Amino acid sequence: MGFKTPYSKRNKLRRLIWSMVWTCLARPFPRSMAMGWKRMLLRAFGAKIAPTAVVYATTKVFQPWLLTMDDYACLAEGVDCYNAASIHIGRNATVSQRAFLCTAGHDISDPHHHQTDASIVIEDRAWVCAEAFIGQGVTVSEGAVCAARAVVVKDVESWTVVGGNPAKFIKKRVLINVNGGG
């Protein structure tokens, strides 16, 4: 018995068209140019994108209809947003260069190795640093930081910093007022 994909022919066709549209109409623009155009393309394919969200041209989005980005959310250069299930990026949250958001996996105890999917949530003011991996079903809570190259396979508590493989607690995140006020 061969591998059976969980995706319908309609889904595969929709993803093919999306990939061609993004490659031809968004990728040619350098870095931060044409943000409105890129948001419009994502919205045309069902993404829920705030007018201030930032998506770089080199970002890969598997299924835009399963992506939600709030105000000032950012998917930076080279981010791989493999959203077989939904991904929600909160207000002022940043996913930095070449990070990998992976909502899919396989059931290793299933002899047929069927695909499993679970949503990812990156809450307000969280930061997923460069080349970090966020696994299926993970919530990165408000204000949390996932250090560069962290492998995050469990939820991250609010206002904490995690890092390593697998990611472990490093310290609490404390904001200071750089303007000198109270």
Model region roles, listed by residue range:
Residues 1-3, 180-182:
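Short, Lys/Arg-enriched, disordered terminal segments
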Residues 2-52:
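A transmembrane-helix-recognition feature enriched in membrane-embedded lipid enzymes
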Residues 28-39, 57-70, 74-139, 165-166, ...:
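Flexible, glycine/small-residue-enriched loop-and-beta-strand segment within the central core
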Residues 50, 139, 157:
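Short conserved AdoMet
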Residues 130-154:
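Beta-rich strand-turn-strand
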Residues 158, 163-166:
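Acidic, glycine-centered active-site loop in nucleotide-sugar glycosyltransferases
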